[in-house]
């Protein structure tokens, strides 16, 4: 059985982003600022977000800044203390599968 890989703020850019909640906090396109939702797909240059609106939103990674919510396990008291991480979109500019492979290299040498 494979163990679940923990997502840490310091390694978020190397992980699968699909399923994470996200908010656009900075963009060269002012209409995108404040958009929230869940990442449902990703390409080299775009994050595709599902929100409460009627359609999927395609957000360019370049020249944007995102706030990701990393869910945590419930504590013994039944509380969550989710972590929020700001990421410059330019750090995500690569094909997702190549970015994810890089974490394996980090673990090998780290």
From Swiss-Prot:
The keyword tRNA processing applies. The keyword Nuclease applies. GO terms for cellular component: cytoplasm; ribonuclease P complex. Keywords: Cytoplasm, Endonuclease, Hydrolase, Nuclease, tRNA processing. Its main location: cytoplasm. It catalyses: Endonucleolytic cleavage of RNA, removing 5'-extranucleotides from tRNA precursor. Signal peptide: none annotated. GO terms for molecular function: ribonuclease P activity; RNA binding. Transmembrane segments: none annotated. Gene3D superfamilies: Ribonuclease P/MRP, subunit p29. This is Ribonuclease P protein component 1. The gene is rnp1.
């Amino acid at each position: 059985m494979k163990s679940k890989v923990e997502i840490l703020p310091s390694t978020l850019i190397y992980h699968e982003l699909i399923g994470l909640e996200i908010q656009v906090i900075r963009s060269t396109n002012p209409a995108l600022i404040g958009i929230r939702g869940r990442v449902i797909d990703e390409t080299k240059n775009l994050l595709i977000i599902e929100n409460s609106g009627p359609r999927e939103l395609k957000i360019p990674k370049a020249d944007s800044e995102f706030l990701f919510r990393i869910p945590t396990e419930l504590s013994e008291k039944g509380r969550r203390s989710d972590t929020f991480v700001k990421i410059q979109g330019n750090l995500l500019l690569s094909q997702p599968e190549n970015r994810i492979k890089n974490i394996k290299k980090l673990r090998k040498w780290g």
